Amino acid sequence: MAIVSSVPLASKSCLHKSLISSIHKLKPFCRTIPTLGMSRPGKYVMPSMSMSSPVSDDGVQRRTGGYHSNLWNDDIIQFLSTPYGEPAYRERGERLIDEVKNMFNSISMEDVEFSPLNDLIQRLWIVDSVERLGIDRHFKNEIKSTLDYVYSYWTQKGIGCGIESVVPDLNSTALGLRTLRLHGYPVSAEVLKHFQNQNGQFACSPSETEGEMRSIVNLYRASLIAFPGEKVMEEAEIFSTKYLKEALQKIPVSSLSREIGDVLEQDWHTNLPRLEARNYIDVFGQDTKDTKLYMKTEKLLELAKLEFNIFQSLQKTELDSLLRWWKDSGFPHITFSRHLHVEYYTLASCIAFEPQHSRFRLGFAKACHVITILDDMYDVFGTIDELELFTAQIKRWDPSATDCLPKYMKRMYMILYDMVNEMSREAETAQGRDTLNYARQAWEDFIDSYMQEAKWIATGYLPTFDEYFENGKVSSGHRVAALQPILTMDIPFPHDILKEVDFPSKLNDLASAILRLRGDTRCYKADRARGEEASCISCYMKDNPGATEEDALSHINAVISDVIKGLNWELLNPNSSVPISSKKHVFDVSRALHYGYKYRDGYSVSNIETKSLVMRTLLESVPF
């Protein structure tokens, strides 16, 4: 019989006594951050999702989307003032990094805290902790050495708590499966079968101890990293989801209950690493009673808090630049569309918060904001004649081509033209080659897909599911949201690597598919109210006479589940010639954009969960 282990995680945290005195003098303070979405303190304006009455613009009858206004004005910058950019904090952070490296390096049989009966789970715990706290970028070499050690003891039945453990352990095996798989080690999910009984249930005790619950938490987390055809992972997800939801109803409110709630909430394909770090900071180490382990969790926790807050000083500079771009480009005069530049910057910061990736964050925010304006222009505001003209002129890629365009289109043409050219120059600096024509082709394909959808709207044509879906993967915008921003990073993307992460790669195809499918399940009713009939739901119903909306949604959700497993495989296939590090940023763009549809259409109704994300990860510092 398999045994269950746990590594205790922590009691109430406070600042380590060695924190330098200058930091004690620099404490953050709480304040209310007003936004344009506030009508009065604590009261938020809910948007109308119905289509507004047609409006006249120079005698042209146009539709509007009925979206709420921009939630953020220039005053947002003053609320990003933070003391954590001062040298004292950075110096303290550097010392903590060295201390945590020593924690990794001190793991040995001579360390009294480790023994051949617990060293594997302890090693996995520290790797998992630094990753969930968002500080793993400092410890790449240490993580690699630690996981190499764990993998050297991996068997077809998994692993025990330590190298001399006689019996495999569910907690160690589940956490090992997840962590090793995410780092590209060839580990099979079949190891989980050794923890199932004849009925397919995973070995559990009636008492539901804390150790057992933590094991099931890691089983659930592992089950989300499933590959196609892994039935045992599906069984593990079903079992662990049910177990943890029932456990939440029984156990008192505690750091464990909060951790379980957070884990259930953080689906792998909508999980944003910076948001996960912010949430995990609140529960990490809250129940630790062992003095030595407590000291270790305190160092990790202090470093995580400092890293989180120090990054906000950089975000202030970047957001100031983004707001100037938004204003100088003339976006305030574009009143028919949604304005989500702050929201997109927040998403970028949640998936790429390494300081050196500034160009990626700003490029992603700009590209996505332009995509949104074009979406509203093609779907709602523009006439079919105007849109055909705009589409044709984009292919000329010449500022003089704007002479024949309406005023609002001239502005959008030049915004797109300048943005693509600017990011191409940045990409040339990073990659050492000119990528402008490559990027132009991607944007032309994207705009062609919008033009196709505009024609469907204008003619009332409802395509087949396959016809709609192939076009919809392009119009999802995933490719143009990811392509130029990743090329500006300090990561080499030679042609042979780029073709494996960009169109027409399987990775790009699946990431685009998820965004189209999930987006349609969240938007189809509102889109229909605005006159956009074509969606995955309506096209499926057309192809399957008699099918209801519920039937269509059930089918599409099943397809999404399969696509997610395929995307996992494309990212983590241990036999791939493309490094995970090259694929991960495209994958993370998928996660960020997918997050916007996690609860609803968070791009049209951005004053609920999306606003909360901005507040929690961009505007609010972590208290010490």
UniProtKB/Swiss-Prot annotation:
Signal peptide start and end residues: none
GO molecular function per UniProt: lyase activity; magnesium ion binding; terpene synthase activity
Recorded GO CC terms: chloroplast
Binding site for Mg(2+) 1: 375, 379
Chain positions of motif DDXXD motif: 375-379
Disulfide bond entries: none
Swiss-Prot/TrEMBL keywords: Chloroplast, Lyase, Magnesium, Metal-binding, Plastid, Transit peptide
Any one of the GO BP annotations: monoterpenoid biosynthetic process
Pathway entry: Terpene metabolism; oleoresin biosynthesis
Pfam families: Terpene_synth, Terpene_synth_C
Protein location: Plastid, Chloroplast
Known EC number: 4.2.3.52
Binding-site residues for Mg(2+) 2, renumbered to this chain: 375, 379
Catalytic activity: (2E)-geranyl diphosphate = (-)-beta-phellandrene + diphosphate
Superkingdom classification of source: Eukaryota
Feature: transit peptide: 1-48
Gene3D superfamilies the UniProt entry points to: Farnesyl Diphosphate Synthase, Terpene synthase, N-terminal domain
Cofactor needs: Mg(2+); Mn(2+)
Ligand binding (Mg(2+) 3): 527
CC cofactor note: Binds 3 Mg(2+) or Mn(2+) ions per subunit.
Family: Belongs to the terpene synthase family. Tpsd subfamily.
Domain notes: The Asp-Asp-Xaa-Xaa-Asp/Glu (DDXXD/E) motif is important for the catalytic activity, presumably through binding to Mg(2+).
Job of this protein: Terpene synthase (TPS) involved in the biosynthesis of monoterpene natural products included in conifer oleoresin secretions and volatile emissions; these compounds contribute to biotic and abiotic stress defense against herbivores and pathogens. Catalyzes the conversion of (2E)-geranyl diphosphate (GPP) to (-)-beta-phellandrene.
Name of this protein: (-)-beta-phellandrene synthase 1, chloroplastic
